[in-house]
Regions:
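A cross-family signal for N-terminal binding/gating loops and helix N-caps
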Residues: 1-203
Length: 204
């Protein structure tokens, strides 16, 4: 019963995907964060931490800080670090860790599916955090951390996923935390339409 929506992703060039990808800013210890920012001009950490080694500082979570994030994001795009998909697509992401393999589909979801109870939130968010995130989205116009949703096992969805993961991924790289990241692009209209139908018929 859920709507899944294809979209035109803005994503790294294949040749620098491993250098651009990063964990969330807050998960790095200070010395590791500084080393990455100093040694890697491609890391996305420069976008989410645009004031590194800068004297002109702004308040965290302020509009001024988010404007700097937006400016750095636009700079990365102008330098050719990112590319935008030519047509609406869905994506398969597989994360392989020492603890297991996790595979899912990246796509858009409809906000009204949360409002009408089809997508069930796992927690309520503090109003202050909601206001901050709204300001961030209004200012930056992008969101880099997907929301994780689960769904009941479905053989038809699994069949489409299996077909793609047997092909060469668009991205495949392993990070220092022993995790391997792979991404496949679903741009076949037939496969996208079938996935939309399958998700529409899932139990909520």
């Amino acid at each position: 019963m859920a709507k899944i929506l294809p979209f035109k992703a803005v994503r790294p060039k294949r040749s620098i995907a491993n250098l651009l990808a990063s964990r969330p800013f807050y998960t790095y210890k200070k010395h590791l964060l500084e080393a990455k920012l100093e040694g890697n001009p491609y890391t996305f950490l420069h976008v989410i931490n645009p004031e590194f080694n800068k004297e002109d500082r702004t308040e965290p979570n302020s509009k001024e800080r988010f404007e700097k994030v937006s400016s750095k994001y636009k700079e990365f795009k102008s330098l050719g670090y990112f590319q935008k998909e030519d047509k609406d697509s869905l994506y398969i992401y597989r994360l392989t860790t020492p603890f297991g393999v996790f595979t899912g589909i990246i796509g858009g979801a409809a906000v009204e599916d949360i409002d009408n109870g089809i997508i069930k939130p796992h927690e309520n968010t503090l109003s202050k955090r909601e206001d901050t995130f709204k300001l961030y989205l209004d200012t930056c116009k992008f969101h880099a951390e997907p929301v994780l949703l689960t769904y009941d096992d479905n053989k038809n969805i699994n069949h489409i996923i299996k077909k793609y993961v047997e092909l060469r991924p668009e991205y495949e790289f392993t990070t220092s935390d022993q995790k391997t990241h792979e991404l496949w692009i679903i741009n076949s209209i037939e496969d996208i339409d079938q996935l939309i139908v399958e998700f529409k018929h899932l139990n909520n």
